[in-house]
Structure formats: C-alpha cells, structure tokens
Curated annotation (Swiss-Prot):
Keywords for the protein's UniProt record, in alphabetical order: Cytoplasm, Isopeptide bond, Nucleus, Repeat, Ubl conjugation, Ubl conjugation pathway
Stated role: Ubiquitin exists either covalently attached to another protein, or free (unanchored). When covalently bound, it is conjugated to target proteins via an isopeptide bond either as a monomer (monoubiquitin), a polymer linked via different Lys residues of the ubiquitin (polyubiquitin chains) or a linear polymer linked via the initiator Met of the ubiquitin (linear polyubiquitin chains).
Name of the gene: UBQ3
Native source organism of the sequence: Oryza sativa subsp. japonica (Rice)
Glycyl lysine isopeptide (Lys-Gly) (interchain with G-Cter in ubiquitin) crosslink site(s): 48, 63
Protein known as: Polyubiquitin 3
Length: 381
C-alpha cells in the first residue's frame, strides 16, 4: 500500500509500505528517499508520536494515510562531562540519546574509544543501551567520566573453525561488552554469539569476574545458526511437543507454533520456564532459553467469565474471557467469531474507547458486562 509523509516544509513523500512494517522500517525508507538519518526523525500520526518497534497496523495506519515528519533538532540540551583530570567537556544531546550515543560524542571530541569510557551519574554507572531520559539526566546535568585502563587483561576467544581472537578486556566487562568487541573484530552480531567457558554458557548481563575469567583465559564461541535449535514444551497431561525455534523468536511466535501443532489458541496458553510465566513480547534469548530447554504449558481454562459485545446492527456476541485478557485478546476472539480484523474494531465500555494493551480488569469489566463494537471503515478517516 502507499502512505504519505508530510514534512514541515510542506513537501509530501510517497512510500510503498505494508501493514506489518515497523516504524523503524518506515524511517529507513525515508532515509533512502531523503537522506535524513532515522535518529533525527519523529513521525506523528493522529497526534501521537510513533514508537520505533511498533507496526503501522498497531497504529491503524491504512492506505493513503498521511504521517507528519518532524525533525529532532540537534542540540535539544547541553550536558557536561567531567573527567578525573578535572577537565569539563560540553555536549549537545537529546533526552532520547542512548549512553552509546553520548560515548560516541565524547569520542568525537576527545578521541577516547567508547569501550574505554565508563560514565557515572548520581553514583550509578550508566548502561550503554539506556537513554539519558531513563536516568532522568536533564539539561546542564554533569556526568563523570572514568577511563577503563587499556590492558586490564587479555583473553582469547576460540571459534569452531579453530581461529583464535585476542581481546583486551577488564574483569568488570559484561558478556554483552565482550560480544560487542567480537562484533567489532569479526562482524558477528551479538545475538548470533554464544560464549562458553568451563562448559557453561555465559549470560549477557554478567561480568567476566562473575565467571572467574582471568587473564589469558580462553572462551569458546559457538554461533547460533538461524533456526538452529529445538526446544520442548511439556503439557499438564505429560505430552511433550518438540518445536524448531530461534533465540530471537518471541513468546508470541512460540505460542503460534504450538497452535499450529496442537490447535490451542495462543490466548489459552501460558508458558512457564524456570518457574516464571513468559511474556508475549519477550524473546527466548531474553529468558536465556537455550537448545533442548523444556517449557511447561498451562492452559487458561475457558469460562473465567462471559461478557457480551453488542454491534451497531444490534447483534450481541457472547465471549468467554478472563479478567487478565487484554483488549487485543478480546478483539482476536471477536475476529474468530465474526471474521472482523482487529484493526477494524473499536470497543467502547462505559463511554470510553478501550486501548489494546490494557486488560479487562484495568477497565473494571466484570462478568456479563456489555461492550459496544464500532467498526472502523476501511479507507475511512
């Protein structure tokens, strides 16, 4: 489908997109056409700023919709970075900048490689993937820069091909940091790396010191082949299902695979691993679920409660739901019964339009409550 992107100069750009495209994808297409880096783009639709990881479908953006492009002006605010020598560096940043971005700016000014920088604010070491906003760092805040001394120690990483890579690290480096260094040297994305030491797979958030990895230790690097692992899912009846998955699969994906094999709708599935219920948007890697791990499948019993959904034609649909069901789940059940795609559904209760990520409990919707279904007409406003 085509959508339009209108800039503040009044120029309109036409893009070829799909409902399943993420906002990141759209920004990349704008970069291809206009040369504007994604991190300088803010996209607005229906008065809302669009988040990178969400899809066009999530925002009900349909063919010939118009998005508005606002540029993030560089230099939203100034912050200061104080070094141990007492020197103060001034940086132009935005609240949405990540700590990585800030370290890159320091490198531009001072020539200090990011992997030698540790930034401290309010007594806390700042993590690369987080933003200034996450740490409540505001204009004219002062960060403290501590240097990681080079040559803390060397370690070796041996690949399955027999190649050995030498890395400069410190005991306080996390496994994430080590994977990033391997990426810098070898170009292998961190999410395709598995590091093994003393027969144990190393977890991203832990440090080398946590695993007692010392100078000249050798780690083993195993690549995660795309599609390369099997996991098991055990049901309460004792049946075990085998699934082909990737570490990057989300829990939603896994539930869809179980539905394909067993016919159990995802909204009736609860997956448990290491005693924890798994959340739909997270990945297997997030939970450190590895090959041949076993998940436990618990069914949400139907009949938690009944609610009614009344359409504009006067028809009333009865649904079996639970208080913990999200509005997305309810729309999926309506789709199952009536064939109406969720992105064409608007649900109203007590005069309020219900938001997808919220639960029935959030809106105090109880058994035998009646919701009202209004259709969004395709191609309408």
């Amino acid at each position: 489908m085509q959508i339009f992107v209108k800039t503040l100069t009044g120029k309109t750009i036409t893009l070829e997109v799909e409902f399943s495209d993420t906002i990141d994808n759209v920004k990349a297409k704008i970069q291809d056409k206009e040369g504007i880096p994604p991190d300088q783009q803010r996209l607005i639709f229906a008065g809302k700023q669009l988040e990178d990881g969400r899809t066009l479908a999530d925002y009900n953006i349909q063919k010939e919709s118009t998005l508005h492009l606002v540029l993030r002006l560089r230099g939203g605010m100034q912050i200061f970075v104080k070094t141990l020598t007492g020197k103060t560096i001034t940086l132009e940043v935005e609240s949405s900048d990540t700590i990585d971005n800030v370290k890159a700016k320091i490198q531009d000014k001072e020539g200090i490689p990011p992997d030698q920088q540790r930034l401290i604010f309010a007594g806390k070491q700042l993590e690369d993937g987080r933003t200034l906003a996450d740490y409540n760092i505001q204009k004219e805040s002062t960060l403290h820069l501590v240097l990681r001394l080079r040559g803390g120690m060397q370690i070796f990483v041996k690949t399955l091909t027999g190649k050995t890579i030498t890395l400069e690290v410190e005991s306080s480096d996390t496994i994430d940091n080590v994977k990033a260094k391997i990426q810098d040297k070898e170009g292998i994305p961190p999410d395709q790396q598995r590091l093994i030491f003393a027969g144990k797979q190393l977890e991203d958030g832990r440090t080398l010191a946590d695993y007692n990895i010392q100078k000249e230790s050798t780690l083993h690097l195993v690549l995660r082949l795309r599609g390369g692992m099997q996991i098991f899912v055990k049901t309460l009846t004792g049946k075990t299902i085998t699934l082909e998955v990737e570490s990057s699969d989300t829990i939603d994906n896994v539930k869809a695979k179980i539905q394909d094999k067993e016919g159990i709708p995802p909204d009736q599935q609860r997956l448990i691993f290491a005693g924890k219920q798994l959340e739909d948007g997270r990945t297997l890697a997030d939970y450190n679920i590895q090959k041949e791990s076993t998940l436990h499948l618990v069914l949400r019993l139907r009949g938690g409660m009944q609610i009614f959904v009344k359409t504009l034609t006067g028809k009333t649909i009865t649904l079996e739901v639970e208080s913990s069901d999200t509005i997305d789940n309810v729309k999926a059940k309506i789709q199952d019964k009536e064939g109406i795609p969720p992105d064409q559904q608007r649900l109203i209760f007590a005069g309020k339009q219900l938001e997808d990520g919220r639960t029935l409990a959030d809106y105090n919707i109880q058994k035998e409550s009646t919701l009202h279904l209004v259709l969004r007409l395709r191609g309408g406003l």
